[in-house]
């Protein structure tokens, strides 16, 4: 097999995949309630998931409107609380839902993973490839579409075309 042909084929596949990524259609949603209530509904939606992981209670949730942060959200294990920074999401409900789910996973980890507190040392263990962050991203990606679909069914949000 000619190595040049393989290189050109690989580049072509990459270009097509990149163009498809750029033009993918992402569903857009609009609130039928407040942002605070939306975040609470996402958190309530995770109730059965918390039960299957043996977590008995929800974290508290605070929604910050007033300051844009580098962070989308944060889980604070010492107070079992989640803070969501709305201005960091630019009103994208899919992203807000993903962030709540991501922080819920950290709540589960804080209760069930003995290494959770140690791995919070991002200076030592890094952030992006840190196991707890990878697991939280996998969790949000696994559940975000079903959560949004159920919230549509329940009238909390609706799709816009």
Q: What residues fall within each predicted segment?
A:
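N-terminal membrane-anchoring alpha-helices
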Residues: 8-26
